[in-house]
């Protein structure tokens, strides 16, 4: 009887450990997906900010050139 309880306890313990390892792996897989989405979002934001900055710089140079041509001080 004692041996049977001992072996059942051992099986329960090993089963619990294997289940927790499976859950950790599943959670790790889920985290990778979230990180990928964040990286994609970060890249898109960076590209958008780069385009805004380039657009502002080009617009400012066009405005300077137009004001110079209109005033005749070029």
From Swiss-Prot:
Region forming the signal peptide: 1-22
Key words, A-Z: Amphibian defense peptide, Antibiotic, Antimicrobial, Cleavage on pair of basic residues, Cytolysis, Disulfide bond, Hemolysis, Secreted, Signal
Annotated compartments: Secreted
InterPro entries linked: Antimicrobial_frog_2, Frog_antimicrobial_propeptide
Expression by tissue: Expressed by the skin glands.
Propeptide: 23-41
GO CC field: extracellular region
One Pfam family of this chain: Antimicrobial_2
The keyword Disulfide bond belongs to this UniProt entry's keyword annotation: yes
Disulfide bond sites: 68-74
Primary localization: secreted
GO BP: any one term: defense response to bacterium
Record function comment: Shows antibacterial activity against representative Gram-negative and Gram-positive bacterial species, and hemolytic activity.
Family: Belongs to the frog skin active peptide (FSAP) family. Brevinin subfamily.
Descriptive protein name: Brevinin-2Ef
Source organism (scientific name): Pelophylax lessonae
Lineage: Eukaryota, Metazoa, Chordata, Craniata, Vertebrata
